[in-house]
UniProtKB/Swiss-Prot annotation:
This is Methionine synthase. Its cofactor is Zn(2+). It is an enzyme of class 2 (transferase). Zn(2+) binds at residues 192, 194, 215, 282. Pfam families: Meth_synt_2. The gene is metE. Pathway: Amino-acid biosynthesis; L-methionine biosynthesis via de novo pathway. Its EC number is 2.1.1.-. Belongs to the archaeal MetE family. Binds 1 zinc ion per subunit. Catalyzes the transfer of a methyl group to L-homocysteine resulting in methionine formation. Can use methylcobalamin and methylcobinamide as methyl donors, but methylcobalamin is not considered to be the physiological substrate. It comes from the Archaea. One of its GO terms (biological process) is methylation. Signal peptide: none annotated.
Length: 308
């Protein structure tokens, strides 16, 4: 089975040298490059198959709103439009590091979904409120261009839409927004939705994505959805909300429980190793870095022990 991550990793900054400080004065110093290097090296060392760049430059919303027309921070002050690729530079840098360490490692592109971005901003201009369909679709159009910039460099792009588990956004609008992003592009898409999803799996199955990624370690009620999922499964198996590092045996037991339920799913083919990706429940940004690394390491070890 393939192992991956949801995205974010704890940010570690190195102590600045005199030369670094001089570069900073002239705008030539990137304080986040070391954090990307550490995130990549840790993920590769842990044995993860498909890594991320660590999403080190801010929270999942600010990374995008800080780099699109129409936003001033998390305030909407004009029509939302694409400016230039937002995550591509970090993806390419992370990929260059990873390939030197292990040529077989892949890296995923990650974007925050249009509904989740919309839910996190205050609308002051151009749109009625943060549930305005036009705002959501304009964000989706900008994200489409981001995806077009990424697709030549990654095998999979993940769309983070945690807000969908709250019921705050209309699913038809959300699906249309995702369609704007993915339609006609020859690349695999995953959609990450954390929280309780056992009451909305029928709606999530209708999204035009290849993989649905959910949390199962911190929310075992979600296990029931494995019987009715119609997409490949991103199986969150380590709890990213707590600092306790699960043992290899704990993680292995949960994955095996999920596999047993998946065996009853008549909508997926029976080659289960092709239908499940193993990952943490959510991003790991808020964890101590040693905890994050050891959770990933144990997750990979547990996965290797499982025979399907």
């Amino acid at each position: 089975m393939i192992t991956t991550v949801v995205g974010s990793y704890p940010v570690v900054k190195k102590e600045e040298t005199f030369l670094d400080k001089v570069k900073k004065v002239f705008g030539l110093y990137d304080e986040y490059k070391y954090a990307i290097e550490r995130a990549v090296k840790d993920q590769v060392k842990a044995g993860v198959n498909i890594i991320s760049d660590g999403q080190v430059r801010g929270d999942m919303v600010e990374i995008f709103t800080n780099n699109m027309y129409g936003f001033d921070g998390k305030r909407v002050v004009g029509r939302v439009e694409f400016i230039k690729p937002i995550t591509l530079k970090d993806i390419l840098y992370a990929k260059s590091i990873a390939k030197k360490l292990n040529p077989n490692v892949e890296i995923k592109g990650i974007i925050t979904g249009p509904c989740t971005i919309a839910s996190s901003v205050r609308v002051e201009s151009c749109y009625s409120d943060n549930r305005d369909e036009n705002l959501i679709y304009d964000i989706a159009k900008a994200l489409r261009k981001e995806v077009e910039a990424l697709k030549k460099h990654v095998p999979i792009i993940q769309i983070d839409e945690p807000i969908l588990s709250t019921g705050m956004y209309d699913f038809d609008v959300a699906r249309k927004a995702i369609d704007i992003i993915v339609d006609g592009l020859n690349i695999k898409f995953a959609m990450h939705v954390c929280g309780n999803v056992y009451n909305i799996i029928d709606e999530l199955n209708k999204f035009n994505v290849d993989i649905l990624d959910h949390e199962f370690a911190s929310n075992k009620k979600n296990l029931v959805i494995l019987e009715s999922m119609e997409k490949k499964v991103g199986f969150g198996c380590v709890n990213t909300k707590v600092k306790k590092v699960e043992s290899v045996e704990e993680i292995k037991s949960l994955i095996e429980e999920g596999i047993e339920i998946l065996k009853n799913n008549e909508k997926l083919n029976k080659n289960l190793s092709d239908n499940i990706l193993i990952d943490p429940d959510c991003g790991m940004r808020l964890l101590p870095i040693d905890v994050a690394f050891n959770k990933l390491k144990n997750m990979v070890e547990a996965t290797k022990l499982i025979k399907i």
